[in-house]
């Protein structure tokens, strides 16, 4: 079962316009109850944040992820502005997981991008 905070290799093709595409890492951000249901049923959708190795500029709605702690091959950033739901069939293999601090930063980036401040 995939868990919140895990990084998975996913297949985002076909994509349109400026959507993240190709096979790439993504951080699972859907809650573990939804993830467990999708696993149990063998179908359904989970929510992920795509990751890119282009870290020349990291915006406030993006989170830098260290290769040394995540299982990624190089330092990357999670792109909260690219959040999306994907079919579980798009999950290819687990890579690693973000730290608790990185997941908290990603939660803040998602709040900023989605304007969920309370």
Swiss-Prot record:
UniProt induction comment: Mildy induced (5 to 9-fold) by oxidative and nitrosative stress, starvation, growth in the presence of isoniazid or gentamycin, strongly induced (24-fold) when grown in a non-replicating state.
Knockout-associated phenotype: Individual deletion of mazF3, mazF6 and mazF9 have little to no phenotype, but a triple mutant shows increased sensitivity to oxidative and antibiotic stress and starvation, decreased formation of persisters cells, and a decreased bacterial load and pathogenic damage in infected guinea pigs.
This enzyme's EC code(s): 3.1.-.-
GO molecular function: DNA binding; RNA endonuclease activity
Primary enzyme class: hydrolase
Classification via SUPFAM superfamilies: Cell growth inhibitor/plasmid maintenance toxic component
Annotated keywords: Endonuclease, Hydrolase, Nuclease, Toxin-antitoxin system
Listed GO biological process terms: mRNA catabolic process; negative regulation of growth; rRNA catabolic process; symbiont-mediated perturbation of host process
The UniProt record lists the keyword Transferase: no
InterPro entries in the cross-refs: PemK-like, Plasmid_toxin/cell-grow_inhib
Disulphide bridges: none
Quaternary structure and interacting proteins, as annotated: Forms a complex with cognate antitoxin MazE9.
Function: Toxic component of a type II toxin-antitoxin (TA) system. Upon expression in E.coli and M.smegmatis inhibits cell growth and colony formation. Its toxic effect is neutralized by coexpression with cognate antitoxin MazE9. Acts as an mRNA interferase, specifically cleaving between U and C in UAC sequences. May cleave its cognate antitoxin's gene. In E.coli expression with non-cognate antitoxins VapB27 and VapB40 partially neutralizes the toxin.
Family (UniProt): Belongs to the PemK/MazF family.
Name of the protein described by the UniProt record: Endoribonuclease MazF9
Record lineage: Bacteria, Bacillati, Actinomycetota, Actinomycetes, Mycobacteriales
Gene: mazF9
